[in-house]
């Protein structure tokens, strides 16, 4: 039997047990997509892996998925203004992912960024982010529904279309120029990285 590629899925550091225990988790929809759509074997990457262990980890992987997450990248990584005190942060993930990205690029290892993951790739190469896009009059509100009783179907339903660039692998793979996607973001790319 032929072995399948192994793809690392970054986790988020979350707080449980009324603030008494930190855990590492990734949304089931990310893991399911990697297993079922991409037909690879997922393994979860802890958000706190030591930098000197990254080489050992990446030697075992064929690619990395940078998931979305509740927390946003801290602004000191891209020269942005400090977040309000109530903003959820994940400093261990910030450090881990910002170390993983250049290692993957150096190895020519595929990286797939989703939501926060796209922002992390941009920041890793010198790009900047604008915070709370919904407060900008000329930008669409991409946040998830704000009502507590919203169903998962409502939260994750497609909200807007994206247009693929001429040489996009997605355009080739899907055989279409546009695609409907969901959007749950507070952030958007302000200045895209040069690389």
Please describe what each predicted stretch is.
Residues 191-195:
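A short, hydrophobic C-terminal helix/tail in secreted or cell-surface proteins
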Residues 182-184:
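Short beta-strand segments
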Residues 115:
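Conserved G/P- and acidic residue-centered "switch" motifs that form tight phosphate/ATP-binding loops
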Residues 118-122:
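Hydrophobic, aromatic-enriched interface-forming segments
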Residues 1-112, 123-130, 134-177, 186, ...:
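N-terminal beta1-alpha1 cap of cysteine-dependent amidohydrolase-like domains
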